Amino acid sequence: MTADNQTARRLIELNTEFYRLQAASFSQTRHSAWAGWERLADGLSLGNHAKVLDLACGNLRFERFLQERFPRTRLEFDAIDNCPALSAGAEGIPVRDLDLAQALLEGQGPELSEHDLAVSFGFMHHLPTFEMRCALLELLARATAPGGVFAVSCWQFMDDEGLAAKAEQTTARGISELGLTGLGPRDYLIGWQTRPGVYRYCHHFDDAEVDALAAHLAGRAQLVDSYRADGRTGRLNRYLVFKRTRLG
């Protein structure tokens, strides 16, 4: 475990407050589809109708990407997030308001029906413990129909020299300003647009941890793809793509 429950709870609250207060400016910088989504889509066979789950859907740009990429498929979305302001203005796609990080910390993940595709992008790095990250994978597996696909992204921002330097600086400053203790290895506090006192908690994934996450589902899901994509370097996220076999 990278953080005790008290620290984990505080980090979750920090992120909830960040997105609540910075939703407008954050969403304005989040319009383009991720390059890594294209590779995922290349391997999908969604047919005429597909149920899609998106955990921590943000401003619904993945939903818009799928609609453009699969115009002949009737897509039925189950989108979940705990920041309604991020999806404000989006039409035709209802979003369920749920604090998923808090639910995973308490071991109370939501009951979900089975989907043809289940994803969670830009969220895994906001989960403060390895156990919670495993729980997210288990939740996605349970919410995927046999033969269906589920995928996650793991942010590897410390592999980018510029991002790493900023993360080191903002983390030191944030720990001092917030009086935080208990951060684990590869845990950072990231600033936002040089705004004073504004931080969000993010975890950097090294390849060993990503491999351990993939191994956690051995026997319950088949890892069908693992690759790096996104950002200026094309390597900012590591993706794990699974095919649901059975539940264990």
Report each predicted region and the residues it spans.
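Conserved helix-to-beta-strand junction in the class I
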Residues: 139-146
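A short, conserved alpha-helix within the catalytic core of class I
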Residues: 127-139
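Class I (Rossmann-like) S-adenosyl-L-methionine-dependent methyltransferase catalytic domain
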Residues: 1-53, 58-109, 131, 149-248
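Short, charge-rich binding segments
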Residues: 110-111, 142
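A conserved beta-strand element that flanks and buttresses the S-adenosyl-L-methionine
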Residues: 119
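Short catalytic micro-motifs in class I SAM-dependent methyltransferases
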Residues: 122-126
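Local beta-strand N-terminus motif with an aromatic residue
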Residues: 49, 114-115
